[in-house]
Amino acid sequence: MRRVIYVDSGPVSDGHIPRPDLPADVVEIDLPPLDEMDAMGASLDGLDDNARQRFQDWALPHPAGTLREPIPLRDPRRNDTPATMICCSITSDTVRQLAAAGSDMFAPVAQLNHVTFVDLPTGHWPMWSRPIDLADAISAAARD
C-alpha cells in the first residue's frame, strides 16, 4: 500500500467500537432523514436541494455489525504508511490541534509518521457537494 487517503475522517484507535450502543438485533442502519441529521449537527454544508435528493436516493443501509464490533489494529507499521487527510467539515488546523491535545477522536492522527493535510471546506459529504474538487484532491494525493 502506497498511501491511505482519509476523506473527512481519520484513523481510529485499536479496539475502537464506533457504535457500542447498537442492540444486537439491529442488522442494518438506514440513512436518517436529512432534516434529522441537520438537527443532530451532522455537517450537510454545501448540499443544495438536488444533492440532498441524490444523497437520499442513492443511500444504502450500513451493516450494523461493522459499527458494533471492535476494530482490531495489530500492526504498528500502519503508522508508517503515508497518509493524506482531506479535511472538509473541520479545518486541518483544528484536526492538528485536537490530535496534539490528545482528543479521543483525533489522538490516532498524532501517531501517523507521514501525514499531509488538504483543506476542502464543505460538509461531511464532499462527494455530493464538491465532487470534482474531491476527485482532484484524491488524484493529487494518489500521485504523491
Question: Language-model features: where?
Answer:
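Flexible "cap/lid" loop of the alpha/beta hydrolase fold
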Residues: M1, I5-G41, G65, P72, ...
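Short, conserved loop/helix-junction motifs that constitute active-site signature segments
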Residues: M1, R74-D80, A110-L112
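A structural signal for isolated positions on well-ordered beta-strands in alpha/beta enzyme cores
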Residues: R3-I5, T84, T116
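Active-site nucleophile elbow and catalytic-triad environment of alpha/beta-hydrolase enzymes
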Residues: R54-P76
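Short beta-strand/loop motif that positions the catalytic acidic residue
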Residues: N79, M85-C87
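Conserved loop-alpha-helix segment in the C-terminal half of the alpha/beta-hydrolase fold
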Residues: S92-P121, D136-A141
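Glycosyltransferase donor-binding loop in the core domain
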Residues: P126
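Residue-level signal for the nucleotide or nucleotide-sugar donor/cofactor binding architecture
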Residues: S129
